[in-house]
Amino acid sequence: MAIAERRSRSHLALRVRDRVSAEVFFEERFEDGWESKWVKSDWKRDENMAGEWNFTSGKWNGDANDKGIQTSEDYRFYAISAAFPEFSNKGKTLVFQFSVKHEQKLDCGGGYMKLLSGDVDQKKFGGDTPYSIMFGPDICGYSTKKVHAILTKGETNHLIKKDVPCETDQLTHVYTFILRPDASYSILIDNVEKQSGSVYTDWDILPPKQIKDPEAKKPEDWEDKEYIPDPEDKKPEGYDDIPKEITDPEAKKPEDWDDEEDGEWTAPTIPNPDYKGEWKPKKIKNPNFKGKWKAPMIDNPDFKDDPDIYVFPKLKYVGIELWQVKSGTMFDNVLICDDPDYAKKLAEETWGKNKDAEKAAFDEAEKKKEEEEAKDDPTESDDEKPDEEGESDGEGDDESKDIDNEEDDEDVHDEL
């Protein structure tokens, strides 16, 4: 108890000291009493498909007192949210950060969070609830292993056009999304920038400033063929008289061939090595080649600049809404603020402080798992070993078993 109190006091000291320069809109470290701030949705509960959350530090960790919330049931939907005083990020930097750990070695499922605006019935929060920002890792099979960064404008969800690979191991990782007043952004994983750019270019929120002139047409005399037939090249005399096949000069009439019984003998034909097919003049560089024609660009009459493209004026909720085939994903240390430095310090104080101990705990858990699996493996005793005389037959049996096992594996793969 004394250790937990000292830990809370040290956290409080850091919060007070660093919050002087940062405006923190929401911060959740999932300590005792966290449930008073979070609302578990009834979404999918009537269908018995709503998953339950565990409050835990996980199977392996760097600090048993540092807990988060973890999905606990396979093949379930999860939805939970928390409210905070409504604010707009206009004229200020928006920082959205949280940590995720996929203890279950995730095959298919999300690890992302959402920011919502306006008034939301939190008990009905689910997959159809509109959101402003969706951010975080998503894994499914071999094809999807990326960080989502989706910005909603109007009723359209705009996906980031750049690839941002996510972490896929079973350890804790911190994901940070920074959106600035100049519409620039950064995506960090474990306090390391993985992607950056501009909202103007990396999301298709606005129509393009310029478009191809729809009225433009390629001039009739435009030469877009790089090579043309050589007008000086002439077909050789007698070219068309060259036969496709000729009589095989090596063929000889069989000695036992009887013209009366077998008919008149005819030598077989073979492809003519001198036959070159249909004659075509050789190609030369087109002296009038102008390149591939492109329609000229013109200003897009539908383009309208939006200096507030980065703005979300009524942010009010943070939520987790996802589907998981295999449960075990843990969320912790959720932060919404205006100061990237504060977010970085929070990440270092939590994830950074515990990552080495967590890795050691994970390695130890894996070692114990391997030892247990080794104990469970059947070993062949001496009295079960085949004698020398029957050794050949035994090898044949093993080979037959191997073939059967391979066929079983193929059947399982086909079923999947």
UniProtKB/Swiss-Prot annotation:
Region (4 X approximate repeats) residue spans: 194-259
UniProt organism field: Berberis stolonifera (Barberry)
Function recorded in the entry: Molecular calcium-binding chaperone promoting folding, oligomeric assembly and quality control in the ER via the calreticulin/calnexin cycle. This lectin may interact transiently with almost all of the monoglucosylated glycoproteins that are synthesized in the ER.
SUPFAM superfamilies: Concanavalin A-like lectins/glucanases (SSF49899), P-domain of calnexin/calreticulin (SSF63887)
Composition skew (Basic and acidic residues), residue ranges: 210-255, 349-378
Gene Ontology biological-process entries: ERAD pathway; protein folding
Main location: endoplasmic reticulum
Chain positions covered by the region annotation 3 X approximate repeats: 263-301
UniProt remark on domains: Can be divided into a N-terminal globular domain, a proline-rich P-domain forming an elongated arm-like structure and a C-terminal acidic domain. The P-domain binds one molecule of calcium with high affinity, whereas the acidic C-domain binds multiple calcium ions with low affinity. The interaction with glycans occurs through a binding site in the globular lectin domain.
Keyword terms, alphabetized: Calcium, Chaperone, Disulfide bond, Endoplasmic reticulum, Glycoprotein, Lectin, Metal-binding, Repeat, Signal, Zinc
Record field: compositional bias (Acidic residues): 379-416
Homology family: Belongs to the calreticulin family.
Top-level division of the source organism's lineage: Eukaryota
Residues that bind an alpha-D-glucoside: 112, 114, 131, 138, 321
One Pfam family named in its UniProt record: Calreticulin
Glycosylation sites recorded in the entry for this protein: 54
Protein name: Calreticulin
InterPro entries linked: Calret/calnex (IPR001580), Calret/calnex_CS (IPR018124), Calreticulin (IPR009169), Calreticulin/calnexin_P_dom_sf (IPR009033), ConA-like_dom_sf (IPR013320)
Compartment(s) where it occurs, according to its Swiss-Prot or TrEMBL record: Endoplasmic reticulum lumen
GO MF entries: calcium ion binding; carbohydrate binding; unfolded protein binding
Sequence repeat intervals: 194-205, 213-224, 230-241, 248-259, 263-273, 277-287, 291-301
GO-annotated cellular components: endoplasmic reticulum lumen; endoplasmic reticulum membrane
Short sequence motif Prevents secretion from ER: positions: 413-416
Disulfide bond positions: 108-140
Annotated stretches, region: Disordered: 209-281, 349-416
